[in-house]
Amino acid sequence: MIRGSEGKLLAVVALGATLSGCGGDWQNWFETEKVTPAVLTQPDSASQLTDYISRATSAGKRVRMTGNGHAMSDIAITNEVLFTPDKLNQPLNLDRSRLKNPSDPGLVRVESGIKIADLNTYLDAHGRALFNMGGYDGQTLAGIMSTATHGSGLGFGPVTDSVASLQMVVDGGKMVQIEPSNGITNPATFNGRLEENSGIAVQLIQDDDAFNAARVGIGSLGVIYSVTLNTDQKFWLREVRHEIKWSELKKPGGYLDRVIHGLPVYGDGQPSPEHWELQYTPYADANGDHTFLITDRYHSYTPLPEQPSSERGQPGTDFASGLVALLGQPLAGILDTFPELAKPVLETTLNAEIDDNYTNVSYKVFNIGVVNDTPALAVETAFTLDQVSAAIERCFTISDAAMSQGIPQTGPIAIRFVKQSSALIAMQNGHNTAFMEIIELRAGKNAKKLLGMHQTAYRQEFNARPHWGLDLNSLTSEAQARALYPDTWDRWKTQYRRFNVSGTFDGKVTDRLGISVRPR
């Protein structure tokens, strides 16, 4: 007898069937997107993925796979068949007999739904590490891949640039293994079968455009089953945080100028941090200047002291961050009522993070900690490096204009630097990139309005690219997307149509962009 969600799935995707009310609600972490799909289920194997997707294609149903809900946009959702990744979260065997270089120690294979926190724990136990990551580790690997999520440091691309190979279930329930043209797999020793289940055929595709489309596919080419990653050996980070004024930071030959031009940040003979980022308040001080916090992170392959998070920043910072996470809603209400208080709040927040030395294993330094639990909204925008100073100063004017309307900026603004990527619609495609992330307390009555003001200005004035996940669904036509990716959009779309022949992986995002194979 077929029971539970599997039975519901078979019912809803049976050819010609109609069924409602058997799924349940799904909502993202930001509470900006909520759907009641006809089916909401957790595939637990490649066999289930291929079977469910085959049936969905036959019935003309749409399928999407969520991550952990940390995309603010509609990228992950559908009203039809929605998968969640909770049961596809394990490390997998890598059959090294299939590889061109079987002895490569850096290759690791995992299921796509593994959370970054669990991936880090697994890698650490095996003496390995991610080269770089963002400040939050609760996301799934497939989620951060598909949206080109990143850390900071111009020596490192987005996390998806560490992908060596991926296995994906595409239209009709077919499993494909996609790699670059010079991929890691030896076609002569590849047996065309899935490692975990020899009953599942796998087509090896070694093609640059297919690979560069699939690894940032915004969930629209198929459902990723497994990922093989290139990893680094385990390393530690020393973090230093210090304040500087904008007038000093931006001057010709100053720190920002040196970073943009690939020069040693602190001058010849001084060590340069591998990871460099900024936080700032958009509000001027009494002298008309702005406070910035620089975060330097230096690599060490020699073990460093592994300090507890309570020793990071000024005394009490960890406790204060936890308090903000707990009291986000009342704090937002206070700042809505007394918006001018946002100015000292932001200055105090930056001051609290100053630290002349914090060390730990890499992934514990990359993770910004309890502040991730703060109920917030966020948008992120990608600029070319030569735009970053002008973009920051435009941010000042937008924030001042909003404050004049009683709309405060309720969190520090971050600037991160990321190496260019060959993924076709990664925000980093074609050039090194500076990202601006703007965070607002979720309960602020005008939070979305302020974020929208920023997004609109940056796209219209800079032709800047919105992050695929941290976005208020700001792109509403294919023409807008093509203008942002003039050299690569049509190449990506060709692969989208190649693997999504029947429209199985259409979704709200493809409807919004006007590219769905079968529009609803």
PLM segments and residue spans:
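Bacterial N-terminal signal peptides
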Residues: 11-18
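Activity-critical C-terminal alpha-helical subdomain
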Residues: 364-371, 446-450, 456-520
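FAD-binding subdomain of flavoenzyme oxidoreductases
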Residues: 144-259
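Flexible, glycine/charged-enriched surface loops at secondary-structure junctions
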Residues: 266-279, 403-414, 462-472
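C-terminal substrate-recognition/cap domain of FAD-linked oxidoreductases
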Residues: 277-449
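Bacterial N-terminal signal peptides that target proteins for export
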Residues: 1-9
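Glycine-rich N-terminal segment of FAD-binding domains in flavoprotein oxidoreductases
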Residues: 32-113, 117-135, 148-153
